[in-house]
A protein has these predicted regions:
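P-loop NTP-binding site
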Residues: 1-16, 21-25, 184, 188-223
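Nucleotide-state-sensitive switch-loop elements of NTP-binding domains
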Residues: 2-104, 139, 172
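Structural beta-sheet core signal
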Residues: 33, 110, 134-136
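Short, glycine/polar-rich helix-capping loops at beta-to-alpha or helix-loop-helix junctions
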Residues: 41-45, 119-124, 146-153
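Short, charged, surface-exposed secondary-structure boundary motifs
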Residues: 65-69, 117-125
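Short, surface-exposed amphipathic charged segments that create phosphate/polyanion-binding patches used
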Residues: 69-74, 172-185, 204-209
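Inter-motif core of Ras-like GTPase G domains
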Residues: 94-116, 125-132
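Canonical P-loop GTPase G-domain recognition
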Residues: 133, 140-195
């Protein structure tokens, strides 16, 4: 089974890209889709109604959504394989810029909106620097000069990343992405690891302390 993990900030076009991928492959292979979010998500319902594919969603609750993704991904792989899926697409919440949801196997795709600002790639850290592919969306809403600057900023963060631009609603210029998915090897579910290093550790705020100020906190976070 192949694995594709799609990350990116809210409203960047992750679900629109997912729909284009599903539309392209749904008649060739069996697809499963997992959405990880915090409060509410409707993408699973949309994809199931529109394309009739297997879908699930997970709410992270009190966990960071990307930490929750690490916890549930093993079960998701088992679920997809048990349903004879050929491709599992995981769409992250994209809310934790310090974390990277990508694994040592499969394809990691970062979706960036061209209208998010030219400094967005630099601010997103590991979500960009550890991705295999960057898809820049909403290119019809900016000038050619702005697009070139965005590409340059992404290259400064990750020199080897595979770049492509699209209007994800229409799905133009994505043939290379489809080829990369088609050519990607299947995963070995017993040897899946995070590609990057996780954050330093759990701080007192993570475990529920609400007091304001350094004097109330201790451990890995120090002044």
């Amino acid at each position: 089974m192949k694995l594709v993990i799609i990350a990116g900030p809210p409203s960047a076009g992750k679900t629109s890209l997912t729909k284009q991928i599903v539309k392209r492959f749904k008649d060739e292979i069996k697809i499963a889709f997992l959405k990880i979010d915090v409060v509410k998500a409707f993408e699973d319902i949309e994809l199931r109604k529109e394309f009739g594919i297997l879908t699930r969603k997970i709410y992270s609750g009190d966990l960071c959504p990307d930490h929750a993704g690490v916890m549930v991904l093993g079960d998701a792989v088992e679920w997809a394989e048990a349903n004879s899926a050929d491709l599992l697409i995981v769409e992250s919440a994209g809310l934790c810029l310090r974390c990277s949801p990508y694994l040592n196997q499969g394809l990691g795709i970062i979706v960036l909106s061209s209208i998010s600002g030219i400094h967005a790639p630099e601010k997103m850290g590991a979500m960009v620097s550890l991705a295999d592919i960057a898809v820049i969306t909403k290119i019809d809403l900016v000038s050619q000069a702005e697009r070139e600057v965005m590409i340059q900023k992404i290259r400064e963060v990750h020199t080897q990343i595979i770049l492509m631009e699209t209007n994800a609603l229409q799905g133009n210029s994505l043939n290379r992405l489809y080829d990369l998915i088609r050519e990607s090897p299947g995963i070995d579910k017993d040897n899946l690891f995070l590609k990057g290093n996780p954050p330093l550790g759990t701080c007192t705020i993570c475990v529920g302390k609400k007091e304001i100020g350094w004097k109330h906190h201790f451990g890995v976070i120090q002044k």
